[in-house]
Amino acid sequence: MMIHGFQSSHQDFSFGPWKLTASKTHIMKSADVEKLADELHMPSLPEMMFGDNVLRIQHGSGFGIEFNATDALRCVNNYQGMLKVACAEEWQESRTEGEHSKEVIKPYDWTYTTDYKGTLLGESLKLKVVPTTDHIDTEKLKAREQIKFFEEVLLFEDELHDHGVSSLSVKIRVMPSSFFLLLRFFLRIDGVLIRMNDTRLYHEADKTYMLREYTSRESKIANLMHVPPSLFTEPNEISQYLPIKEAVCEKLVFPERIDPNPVDSQSTPSE
């Protein structure tokens, strides 16, 4: 679980023609949460919902991609078969106490599992999503390069009524000639299941596209008896033990009508 300081911050960083923005602030107010829950047709939202938190990568021409909690929850499938676990009924009952206790609770994914891969920005100009067999060069990422900028943004987190955790966070690091982003949805239902949906985004300054890789991993706890339980709470450590259920590789191709380097800007952070 992440440690939450809840200190508001806003950081901008220039990387060639790109402006990288990381905004972090407090959790949403209850009135705003209720309004958004109605809009999303969900009985409740994650306990810690950071609706104004965002990590944005935007080109000087206007197109780009951003990552936010609201759009991530729009990708939650409330109509597929729900997880049937011992804690589900108890957990849902705890969420229906109070003024809405007499309402009929429609089925929804109480784990908040999302396959969100980011929100494309721009109106007339947008990134074009193209399937590819190319992969992110992990060896390049292992190279010792100076980190010019790093930020991590929590989008939502829920402890599932003390039965585990469901969280979504995004982090980015910028090197002299490239940037790498990881969006991670992590779900642990104690004694039942571990699930991890990762979206990786990589761009090299001399390329006219970004590479985006999405992987979904999952395993029942019963199939992880050979793994030390201490790793169940460590996403980076447990991922290697989770079988891949889905993998998608895409290129996010820049619009043809733009100069990939419209401005000669320096890679400098600003508060």
From Swiss-Prot:
Q: Which UniProt keywords apply?
A: Acetylation, Cytoplasm, Phosphoprotein
Region (Interaction with PPP2CA) location:
173-271
Q: Which domain of life is it from?
A: Eukaryota
Q: Which residues carry this modification: N6-acetyllysine?
A: K106
Pfam families on file: TIP41
Per the UniProt entry, the signal peptide is: none
GO cellular component entries: cytoplasm
Q: Where are the transmembrane segments?
A: none
Residues annotated with Phosphoserine modification? S265, S270
Q: Which GO terms describe its biological process?
A: DNA damage checkpoint signaling
Give the Gene Ontology MF terms in alphabetical order.
protein phosphatase inhibitor activity
The main place the protein resides is: cytoplasm
Question: InterPro entries annotated for this entry?
Answer: Phosphatase_reg/MetRdx, TIP41-like
Give the subcellular location.
Answer: Cytoplasm
Protein family (similarity comment): Belongs to the TIP41 family.
Role, per record: May be a allosteric regulator of serine/threonine-protein phosphatase 2A (PP2A). Inhibits catalytic activity of the PP2A(D) core complex in vitro. The PP2A(C):TIPRL complex does not show phosphatase activity. May play a role in the regulation of ATM/ATR signaling pathway controlling DNA replication and repair.
Its subunit composition reads: Interacts with PPP2CA. Interacts with PPP2CB, PPP4C and PPP6C. Interacts with IGBP1; the interaction is dependent on PPP2CA. Associates with a protein phosphatase 2A PP2A(C):IGBP1 complex. Interacts with PPP4C and PPP4R2.
Give the protein's recorded name: TIP41-like protein
